[in-house]
């Protein structure tokens, strides 16, 4: 089949690679001048005139991201060369919190809970009892529950030191608003997922090169070597059904994968003259949350690449990353405020004060705000389906699936979309 993939973010790249591997002739359209979507590189100018390539936001992968890691290997990227691995660690600057040892699951989680600092034995037993109950239920629960409701019997120290930061990191949604079902799915895969070689499913994987080198650059090079038509700066204006084919800006294709942002997909589907009311309604009902990354200079070298922070309205960042341990210059810190709001100047001022309360003096360098970073992962959410119309599918982290808006969610959605097209093609044949 001739397949058009609209969008060159991680979902679009995954869809294009999967389609080529399935034997299809692929044309990839990317509207901007850069591939990677919301996980892309950017250049930062330092006060001394140096240019440093960083990212539009600090991303975290985990060892359970099997499809993302597999995609990287397919296009020639060795994850061990571009990702810094460390066992799951949610430690605060005062050293309280949990840090798992580099052991097989579930021994790592058990020991991490037993040795968590700042927790009483009652706190630890509370978490162990809840974890055992969740496992007995297959990490499933009523779809109407929030994470806060699911964990209402947990001790406050565990909620504040583990559940709340883990929830906002994974779902970008506060615990009192976040879907317990999706949260449990992430926990299940992280705690009991299959290891990736020597990497445990719960391991944190932090990029130590810019995001362009983690996947997009290699994926584009691979696609071009395999004969795909890669078009950059090519915003698709319209798609149209024409009998058994689809016209993409007048060019005929057998199938189309919409791997662009949901707003762009809605624009194209809404003007395509097809019956897609339910899909459009679901896509249009999604609410979105921002993620802000404040880059600062002058910070100390941290004991570990990543620290968890106690966050409130005056201390917006939930995590801080020492970029000097991840391939960046000394003193560069990345402060991540998930589910953030407010203007950039106010956010920067709050982060500077948050750092001062830790005894650190920092200066803002640049703040990147992705206003539509993720959908709000709330209970009972009805996400749009992969299938839109015969020969037309959607791929993206917002599409129906078990994961929240993550890189793994985007890759899995893309692969599912291409599988659906290939299956339909075989049936038609």
Residue spans of the language-model regions?
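Conserved FAD-binding subdomain of flavin-dependent enzymes
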Residues: 38-41, 47-83
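Mobile amphipathic helical/loop "lid" adjacent to a hydrophobic cofactor/ligand pocket
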Residues: 65-191
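N-terminal Rossmann-like FAD-binding beta1-loop-alpha1 element of flavoenzymes
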Residues: 2-28
């Amino acid at each position: 089949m001739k397949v058009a993939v609209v969008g060159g973010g991680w979902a679009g790249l995954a869809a294009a690679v999967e389609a080529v591997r399935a034997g299809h002739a692929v044309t990839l359209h990317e509207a901007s001048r850069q591939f990677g979507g919301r996980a892309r590189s950017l250049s930062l100018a330092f006060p001394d005139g140096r240019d440093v390539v960083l990212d539009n936001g600090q991303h975290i992968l985990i060892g359970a991201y099997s499809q993302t890691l597999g995609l990287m290997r397919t296009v020639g990227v060795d994850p061990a060369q571009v990702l810094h691995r460390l066992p799951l660690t949610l430690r605060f600057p005062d050293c309280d919190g949990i840090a798992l040892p580099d052991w097989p699951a579930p021994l790592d989680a058990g020991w991490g809970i037993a040795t968590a600092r700042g927790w009483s034995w009652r706190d630890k037993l509370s978490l162990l009892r809840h974890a055992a109950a969740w496992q007995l239920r297959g990490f499933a629960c009523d779809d109407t529950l929030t994470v806060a409701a699911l964990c209402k019997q947990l001790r406050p120290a565990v909620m504040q030191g583990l559940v709340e930061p883990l929830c906002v990191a994974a779902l970008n949604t506060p615990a009192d608003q976040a879907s317990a079902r999706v949260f449990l799915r992430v926990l299940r895969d992280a705690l009991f997922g299959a290891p990736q070689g020597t990497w445990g499913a719960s391991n944190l994987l932090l990029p130590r090169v810019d995001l362009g080198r983690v996947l997009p650059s290699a994926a584009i090079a691979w696609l071009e070597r395999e004969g795909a038509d890669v078009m950059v700066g090519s915003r698709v204006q319209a798609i149209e059904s024409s009998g058994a084919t689809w016209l993409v800006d007048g060019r005929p294709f057998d199938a189309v994968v919409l791997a662009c942002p949901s707003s762009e997909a809605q624009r194209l589907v809404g003007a395509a003259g097809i019956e897609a009311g339910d899909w459009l309604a679901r896509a249009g009902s999604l609410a979105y949350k921002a993620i802000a990354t404040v880059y600062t200079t002058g910070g100390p070298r941290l004991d570990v690449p990543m620290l968890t922070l106690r966050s409130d309205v005056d201390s917006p960042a939930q995590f801080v990353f020492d970029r000097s341990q991840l391939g960046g210059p000394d003193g560069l810190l990345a402060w991540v405020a998930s589910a953030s709001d407010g203007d950039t100047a106010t956010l920067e001022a709050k982060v500077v004060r948050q750092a001062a309360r830790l005894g650190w003096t920092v200066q803002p360098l640049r703040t990147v705000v992705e206003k539509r970073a993720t959908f709000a992962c709330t209970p009972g959410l009805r996400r749009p389906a992969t299938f839109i119309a015969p020969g037309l599918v959607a791929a993206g982290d917002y599409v129906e699936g078990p994961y929240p808006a993550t890189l793994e969610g985007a890759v899995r959605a893309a692969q599912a979309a291409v599988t659906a097209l290939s299956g339909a093609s075989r049936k038609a044949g």
